[in-house]
Amino acid sequence: MLSANMLRRMHHGVAVTRMLLVSNGKVQVKKSALYPVMAKLARTYATKNYPAHTVINMPALSPTMTTGNIGAFQKKIGDKIEPGDVLCEIETDKAQIDFEQQDEGYLAKILIETGTKDVPVGKPLAVTVENEGDVAAMADFTIEDSSAKEPSAKSGEEKSAPSSEKQSKETSSPSNVSGEERGDRVFASPLARKLAEEKDLDLSQIRGSGPNGRIIKVDIENFKPVVAPKPSNEAAAKATTPAASAADAAAPGDYEDLPLSNMRKIIASRLAESKNMNPHYYVTVSVNMEKIIRLRAALNAMADGRYKLSVNDLVIKATTAALRQVPEVNAAWMGDFIRQYKNVDISMAVATPSGLITPVIRNTHALGLAEISTLAKDYGQRARNNKLKPEEYQGGTFTISNLGMFPVDQFTAIINPPQACILAVGTTVDTVVPDSTSEKGFKVAPIMKCTLSSDHRVVDGAMAARFTTALKKILENPLEIML
């Protein structure tokens, strides 16, 4: 009786697959679940006597990703694949990402064509073989021949109901993933493991944002154990009825239905949840920008081409200084406790053709203006080109949304959960203000309005007032930024 155990080694987050060959030629395959960022690879000998091959599945490239759109394949059938080669482009809910491979081989079959939308995480995308001579033998291979089980929309209903405690953990956050989906082995930094142990958290329920899906400190800090209850079917039906009626009443040719991108779907879901669940309130302050504008001009004049500061760069730096003075605002709602951050990581709202994304400038309290300016320009450009890496837009402790480039005097923004606050920055408007030093008793000054949206569960009105007062003082006396 022929039997052998084959064990693929764990390599940078690639899932482990065990195979057992038995005498009748059949194969039993036991797969561990997809580890974040990397694809699930399943080595198998299928029942149709295909040669040894590897099935490459749709990876989870961000904590909130459940489906992805397939862009252009960078390899053709028969091409050799080296570690680090890009197989194809995948549009996630946040960006367009190059899907790199970790093992060498030859591309033998493409199962999902370029342009396919809403491909579920875990669905087979392609097949590779180790030997070039085996490529032709895979020509008739189909998804049904794959050992990887296709995800089903009803899979959650078909499984036995978990205990209420486990179910709560599994559905508590977009960054959660069940142990069954994740596999037995979890990659985490020593500090992350220590923090998880202190907080009594199950690492298998946390999706990592570090290199190749590794769980790092920020993942532990951002893990949310509580989620909003889903609306009842009756409530959902009532909510959708007016929209359906309006659509039915519209005359043909009066409108165009635009498909939703993955990013737009996630924006709709997260912001609706934030607005419905987080008790928002707003505090607005008017800032005289005379001195900050003069400081910007002076610094740019002496830059000698090394940098070019924008008003937004100075706003980021001033906001950072204000957060250090009022740290209660640099916080997050974590369900049964409030997390107050010691570091300042500014999420910067950037408009892209696909929707809004918030790249994170980390540790702005330790960066100079030139460094902030360089990072802001780089992240902004790559965000608009869908070239951000997942770790560059995940996390953040405080968000700034600046519409100062438009003629928008003032606006309010929706909080980016789990953060407690977001600052909405308007344009600078020449405004008549009192001036005791002028014979006329007034002057015209460039005034900018900033509105802080706060989660009242975390930040009380007095805290918001102290923060906006500190921000106003720093912007109107910008030498404080240098301290």
Swiss-Prot record:
Entries under PROSITE patterns matching the protein: BIOTINYL_LIPOYL, LIPOYL, PSBD
Broad class of enzyme this protein falls into: transferase
EC number: 2.3.1.12
Active site: H456, D460
Location, primary (coarse class): mitochondrion
Molecular functions (GO terms): dihydrolipoyllysine-residue acetyltransferase activity
Reported cofactor(s): (R)-lipoate
Residues annotated as transit peptide in the record: 1-28
UniProt domain Peripheral subunit-binding (PSBD): residue ranges: 187-224
CDD domains: lipoyl_domain
Domain Lipoyl-binding: 53-129
Composition bias type Low complexity, residue spans: 235-252
Reactions this protein catalyses: N(6)-[(R)-dihydrolipoyl]-L-lysyl-[protein] + acetyl-CoA = N(6)-[(R)-S(8)-acetyldihydrolipoyl]-L-lysyl-[protein] + CoA
Localization per Swiss-Prot or TrEMBL: Mitochondrion matrix
Polar residues bias locations: 161-178
Region (Disordered): 143-187, 234-254
Comp. bias intervals (Basic and acidic residues): 146-160
Modified residues (N6-lipoyllysine): K94
Cofactor: binding comment: Binds 1 lipoyl cofactor covalently.
NCBIfam families linked: PDHac_trf_mito (TIGR01349)
Role according to the record: The pyruvate dehydrogenase complex catalyzes the overall conversion of pyruvate to acetyl-CoA and CO(2). It contains multiple copies of three enzymatic components: pyruvate dehydrogenase (E1), dihydrolipoamide acetyltransferase (E2) and lipoamide dehydrogenase (E3).
Family: Belongs to the 2-oxoacid dehydrogenase family.
Remaining remarks: The E2 component contains covalently-bound lipoyl cofactors and it participates in the generation of acetyl groups from hydroxyethyl-thiamine pyrophosphate-E1 and their transfer to coenzyme A.
Protein name according to UniProt: Dihydrolipoyllysine-residue acetyltransferase component of pyruvate dehydrogenase complex, mitochondrial
